[in-house]
């Protein structure tokens, strides 16, 4: 009996092996995970916590690489998303784990908004209010809405099948930040040099140039957003995002022909918010 018991005991798998078998079978099981199985949720929470913790640790941020990304978002945005794919292979996530890009983007927003406030002749407190609106409303709050929309749509309708991993919300927000930077520089920086002496006038060339800046900015935003989701191999029909491009061009033609200067309208809107 003792020998039999010993043989029986040695043939039983160890608890760690049982746990491994259980985890493996859970991954391939068609049954839904148990209520206490929150691996993905906890992982996302942990990643978000680490990301937010690093926001004030500037010595741990790679600003040189973030500047490289900003440059290539203008000239070759495909190269930026190749790095996102590399991050997925090495760190098992598409979203950035380094907030350097976000920090530099906020700095650019503040600096260009100060220039915009100077051109508009805003007072000190109006300039502070203007910067607050641009950073926290126009960029971050609107970005949260847009990222949540694309996150929900891509996960529900654009995945090749339900077994593929979900698109991370953090990645959707990164796509928004990437797409936001070129329009920011076009509309909040380069356009300022033409506003007072040309774009703000009533001439045809004034509204044509002002509307062209908006056409380029919105075109950049749509195209970079498309690249962000098109680079993910398990998404399908991402070209539907490009439908917005001919619509934007048609709107450009219509508003230019009817005599509407989009830049002047948005400048008046900016003034209305801070007065």
UniProtKB/Swiss-Prot annotation:
From the record, give the transmembrane residue ranges.
100-120, 130-150, 179-199, 208-228, 240-260
Keyword Membrane among UniProt keywords: yes
Specify the protein's topology with respect to the membrane: Multi-pass membrane protein
Q: Where is the signal peptide?
A: none
Regions of this protein lying in the Cytoplasmic compartment:
1-99, 151-178, 229-239
Chain positions covered by the region annotation Disordered = 1-39
What is the recorded function of this protein according to its Swiss-Prot or TrEMBL entry?
A: Required for cell surface expression of acetylcholine receptors.
Lumenal side of membrane: 121-129, 200-207, 261-275
Q: Give the organism the record lists.
A: Drosophila melanogaster (Fruit fly)
Q: Where is the composition biased (Polar residues)?
A: 1-26
Q: Which family does it belong to?
A: Belongs to the unc-50 family.
Protein name per its UniProtKB record: Protein unc-50 homolog
Matching PANTHER family, A to Z? PROTEIN UNC-50 HOMOLOG
Write out the GO cellular component annotations.
Answer: Golgi membrane
Gene Ontology biological process terms, A to Z? vesicle-mediated transport
Q: Which Pfam families match?
A: UNC-50
Database matches in InterPro entries: UNC-50
User: Which top-rank group of organisms is this from?
Assistant: Eukaryota
Keywords, sorted A to Z:
Golgi apparatus, Membrane, Transmembrane, Transmembrane helix
């Amino acid at each position: 009996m003792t020998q039999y018991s010993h043989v029986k005991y040695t043939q039983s798998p160890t608890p760690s092996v049982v746990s491994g078998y259980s985890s493996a079978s859970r991954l391939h099981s068609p049954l839904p995970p148990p209520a206490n199985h929150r691996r993905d949720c906890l992982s996302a929470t942990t990643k978000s916590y680490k990301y937010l913790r690093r926001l004030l640790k500037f010595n741990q941020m790679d600003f040189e690489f973030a500047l490289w990304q900003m440059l290539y978002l203008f000239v070759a945005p495909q190269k930026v998303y190749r790095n996102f794919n590399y991050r997925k292979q090495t760190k098992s996530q598409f979203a950035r784990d380094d907030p350097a890009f976000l920090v530099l983007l906020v700095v650019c927003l503040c600096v260009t908004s100060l220039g915009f406030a100077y051109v508009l002749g805003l007072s000190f407190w109006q300039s502070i209010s203007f910067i607050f609106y641009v950073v926290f409303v126009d960029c971050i709050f609107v970005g949260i809405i847009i990222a949540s929309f694309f996150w929900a749509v891509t996960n529900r309708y654009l995945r090749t099948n339900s077994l593929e991993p979900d698109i991370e919300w953090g990645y959707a927000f990164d796509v928004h930040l990437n797409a936001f930077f070129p329009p920011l520089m076009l509309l909040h920086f380069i356009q300022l040099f033409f506003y007072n002496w040309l774009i703000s006038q009533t001439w045809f060339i004034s509204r044509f140039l002002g509307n062209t800046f908006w056409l380029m900015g919105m075109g950049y935003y749509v195209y970079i957003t498309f690249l962000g989701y098109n680079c993910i191999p398990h998404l399908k029909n991402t070209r539907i995002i490009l439908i917005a491009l001919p619509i934007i061009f048609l709107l450009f033609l219509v508003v230019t022909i009817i005599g509407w200067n989009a830049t002047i309208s948005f400048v008046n809107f900016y003034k209305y918010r801070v007065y």
